């Protein structure tokens, strides 16, 4: 897959711990090192702690992975706040770090390049504005702009009780006038009720 990405001009791929089985840190390091021997595509080391095996990578393991020549970035989050912050502090001097753990203002102060968000799929102006304020050092204002949208957005998103991410992005895309397709099972589009669609349209109008 990495070779295909390289062939079609993709610059960067996410590399995380394996998904289905109990994760042993040395297993993760061994297989990512092996992949690197067969491709020149860039790696973004990804701590995928919130689904699948729920392996929450330690900063020590992340630091070993960014020593692999392909590694140029880290998509960093953690279920443990101490691990999250230590990851920011120790990885930022070495690679481009994309914040995947909240604390947008603080992470930007530490030197994160940007943050992960689904919102640009349907309302990019929201995150452009937040990022612009972060870059200007207007952190209080950035947090307010972020919270004013994200708190009601998260409330709506959490009411969509089914697996997956596309299933809650698609109705927002549709409300914004974009083509969104359908979800694959086990994600069930039927759980997005008319009331949820109404709440989505109301939020985007505001």
Locate predicted features.
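Helix-coil boundary/capping segments in enzymes
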Residues: 2, 94-100, 165-168, 174
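Active-site beta->alpha loop and helix N-cap motifs at the rims of alpha/beta catalytic domains
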Residues: 1-56, 188-189
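Catalytic alpha/beta core domains of metabolic enzymes, predominantly
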Residues: 38, 49-161
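Conserved short secondary-structure transition element at the edge of the structured enzyme core
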Residues: 153-187
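Flexible C-terminal active-site loop/helix
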Residues: 177-206
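Short amphipathic alpha-helical surface patches that mediate protein-protein
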Residues: 3, 147-151, 174
